[in-house]
Amino acid sequence: MQRVTITLDDDLLETLDSLSQRRGYNNRSEAIRDILRGALAQEATQEHGTQGFAVLSYVYEHEKRDLASRIVSTQHHHHDLSVATLHVHINHDDCLEIAVLKGDMGDVQHFADDVIAQRGVRHGHLQCLPKEE
């Protein structure tokens, strides 16, 4: 492990310390390493050809204009990416779905974009993790 020195303005340092405390990091170095890993993972996931895993979560109105069937159709069109899906009924109108995905990160991003762009889908979020060699 290498020791490096960085310079941060006061506001950014205060924000880092606040984040570190909220997340329970023992020191700034652990927080910065985690933030850097996240940024590098996100960067890696934007390239076609990179293999990895992802979690796609979203809330949708299940009775909105055949939305449920459109989402299922999209899932079947990308069946090779899907590892598992969890479906939760939030209330009478809304459902939460969480899909675990595996494959080419460009294809995963395309699938997530297709789902999240559907009218009636809210709070869509894709968390990607590149496959470690």
From Swiss-Prot:
Could you list this entry's UniProt keywords, alphabetically sorted: DNA-binding, Metal-binding, Nickel, Repressor, Transcription, Transcription regulation
The positions annotated for binding Ni(2+) are 76, 87, 89, 95
Q: Molecular function terms in GO for this entry?
A: DNA-binding transcription factor activity; nickel cation binding; sequence-specific DNA binding
Pfam families xrefs = NikR_C, RHH_1
Stretches of the chain forming a coiled coil according to its record? none
Keyword Transcription regulation: yes or no? yes
Name the cofactor(s) required for activity, per the record: Ni(2+)
Q: How is the cofactor bound?
A: Binds 1 nickel ion per subunit.
Q: In which family does this protein belong, per the annotation?
A: Belongs to the transcriptional regulatory CopG/NikR family.
Q: What does this protein do?
A: Transcriptional repressor of the nikABCDE operon. Is active in the presence of excessive concentrations of intracellular nickel.
Q: How does it assemble?
A: Homotetramer.
Q: What is this protein called?
A: Nickel-responsive regulator
